[in-house]
């Protein structure tokens, strides 16, 4: 069953009289980062209208569930191959929890399992769950673990659009993401403007220098924009030494709660930026080693600052240099120019 047909008939997609208990069961895999799970949120939320959805992801999925897809179930599991280093130290893998997780999932008797990642490890995991239908993007022979393989979208396609293609195969309509050029304000603010500025990122190669973020804060404050400054734990002392009040959330739930009071987000190419976009906040994201066409936050009014050219881009955070030139060469003036346009559209 590797053809291009939809699974709508195979899994008996619901009509208007069906209840949650007799909806088909859908297993969604997104083992990787906060940003990846936030990008999947539109698909997950839409899928709950047609399926009993279970999401397998890292534990912060429990924080996202009530906020972004309240009708989905969560099974938290940390896939060892998502570690940045030592991912194939098999002697350190949680074999017992892997066995328990797969046993639990097999007991659910899923009608469909899906992954939007071009990853044979996901496909093997789906095969072990014994889901009746397994849908994904095959690679290196992993089509043997799938019942439906989907051709990869064009190289320049956004990561969000892989979820759109998965949705097409199982009868879940998730529109393709297309970034829009924002040239004028479309809605007025009903409260004083407040903007999140988040200076952290999952990896150091994605962290724009803090002294440059400080200049952004100074400009925002001069423009009468209230700033909620958020940083990662290791950055806190620097900000406090520069007399800035800073918030260091202890969980994804705390991060989301803090951002609820804001109308826009400014930060690095990071999970918090994708979370902000999923929450409906327009984003201005400063990129370095990653490709913006793949991973810009999927808010239609979002803006990006492109990192400098590098022959190794994208390096997937494995920078070959002592410092990431692609990010270091993004000047304060370059970001300020974008920030002023961003504020005019979204915070004035």
Regions found by a protein language model. Name each.
Residues 1-348:
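Catalytic machinery of carbohydrate-active enzymes
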């Amino acid at each position: 069953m590797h053809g291009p047909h939809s699974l709508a008939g195979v899994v008996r997609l619901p009509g208007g009289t069906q209840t949650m208990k007799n909806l088909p069961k859908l297993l969604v895999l997104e083992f990787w980062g906060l940003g990846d799970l936030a990008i999947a949120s539109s698909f997950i939320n839409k899928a709950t209208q047609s399926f009993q959805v279970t999401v397998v992801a890292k534990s912060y999925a429990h924080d996202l569930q009530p906020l972004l897809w309240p009708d989905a179930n969560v099974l938290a599991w940390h896939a060892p191959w998502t570690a940045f280093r030592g991912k194939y130290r098999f002697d350190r893998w949680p074999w017992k929890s892997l066995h328990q997780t797969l046993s639990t999932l097999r007991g659910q008797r899923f009608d469909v399992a899906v992954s939007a990642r071009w990853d044979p490890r996901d496909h093997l995991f789906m095969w072990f769950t014994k889901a009746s239908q397994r849908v994904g993007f095959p690679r290196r022979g992993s089509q043997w673990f799938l019942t439906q393989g989907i051709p990869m979208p064009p190289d320049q396609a956004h990561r969000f659009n892989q979820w759109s293609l998965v949705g097409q195969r199982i009868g879940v309509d998730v529109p393709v993401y297309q970034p829009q050029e924002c040239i004028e304000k479309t809605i007025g603010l009903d409260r004083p403007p407040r903007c999140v500025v988040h200076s952290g990122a999952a990896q150091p190669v994605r962290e724009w220098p803090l002294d440059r973020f400080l200049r952004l804060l100074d400009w925002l404050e001069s423009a009468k924009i209230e700033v909620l400054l958020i940083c990662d734990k290791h950055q806190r002392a620097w900000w406090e030494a520069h007399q800035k009040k800073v918030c260091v959330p202890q969980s994804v739930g705390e991060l989301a709660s803090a951002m609820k009071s804001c109308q826009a987000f400014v930060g690095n190419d990071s999970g918090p930026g994708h979370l902000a976009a999923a929450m409906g906040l327009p984003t201005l994201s400063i990129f370095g080693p990653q490709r913006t066409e793949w991973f810009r936050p999927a808010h239609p009014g979002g803006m990006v600052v492109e990192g400098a050219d590098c022959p190794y881009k994208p390096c997937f955070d494995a920078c070959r240099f002592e410092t990431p030139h692609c990010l270091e060469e993004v000047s304060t003036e370059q970001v300020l120019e974008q920030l002023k346009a961003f504020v005019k559209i979204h915070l004035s």
